[in-house]
Amino acid sequence: MKTKVAAIYGKRDVRLREFELPEITDNELLVSVISDSVCLSTWKAALLGSEHKRVPDDLENHPVITGHECAGVIVEVGKNLTDKYKKGQRFVLQPAMGLPSGYSAGYSYEYFGGNATYMIIPEIAINLGCVLPYHGSYFAAASLAEPMCCIIGAYHANYHTTQYVYEHRMGVKPGGNIALLACAGPMGIGAIDYAINGGIQPSRVVVVDIDEKRLAQVQKLLPVELAASKGIELVYVNTKGMSDPVQMLRSLTGDAGFDDIFVYAAVPAVVEMADELLAEDGCLNFFAGPTDKNFKVPFNFYNVHYNSTHVVGTSGGSTDDMKEAIALSATGQLQPSFMVTHIGGLDAVPETVLNLPDIPGGKKLIYNGVTMPLTAIADFAEKGKTDPLFKELARLVEETHGIWNEQAEKYLLAQFGVDIGEAVQ
């Protein structure tokens, strides 16, 4: 089977590549990858090349396919797997394999990654339960289950303690105060959505950022009134220019501090602020992954000793987290499409990945069977004045107030003749 992929050849070197895949073994799957949402972690891998902990050497001869937030359709089933999978079945990939090497899809494999028209899912990924049946029909939601899975996993990884009781209580504090720092970006939107609609029931959620445009957009998507209807106080705060943001934010809790804090940017000042905002037994989750292996920040160890403050760091999520993300999306409790601001085809991947931090907006969603430059959804109407494809896409997203949706996805895929398989029960 001939495939077309976006692959990492070295530091800051991402190229399109077209080649013949080898025949699958009896314990492998050949799949068509319909969609892949671009993760900042992919940019980090492209930036560092083989210096990245998950990226192997010899990229020039064995380039690795980018992308891991993907979903698609099974095309061919190895003969030893026919009792579990069938041709035409839709799937979503759980890329967190948990291998000692750190290897996973989108970082480490020549034939296994989300930015591909076709890829081979290896035996090890299948044995680890990384191929989940997808019973829905909206591939964007399936791709976005992976970033939502990471967000959900972070909430589950936080913990709290009772003095002289030597078992941690996992998860955020019920009825507690949550602070989401640097959290008006694409992943932040998912974190706010889960805090409000994921059933964890904090009493207060404070969202902090310094980008007023991003804050205004997320307030439209997740208004304070929605949170209030669920018994949650939601507060959006722009700390840019504040003389003492810590004092202001602590005042929102009566100076008690925050029980659970999630840091969504690897910026020393943000981590230091999080430390100062912790309540007694407060848990700081360092969600953002730094590229600097020597990233260090001062931390108040007086409070660690006397106030039981503590830190966790999370990357990825479990299969159960992924299943929760899919289920909450299917019922409409979570709206992962809120994160998406740009749509593109496979041809757009190299430039998108290499310039990701400099492209404004939220998640960039790629359809591998489509040829299309990366385009902001907000620009569809203008482009539609001269291009009938964008004219119809603009009409379809207008029905959901500018949010990407299943109808728009189906129309786009149909225009390029992409086979979307079937939902196998």
Per-segment meaning from a language model:
Residues 22-37, 51-100, 113, 125, ...:
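Glycine-rich beta-strand-centered segment in the early N-terminal region that forms part
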Residues 162, 220, 243-250, 256, ...:
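C-terminal hydrophobic helical "lid"/dimerization subdomain
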Residues 269-272, 276, 288-308:
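Rossmann-fold NAD(P)-binding glycine/threonine-rich loop
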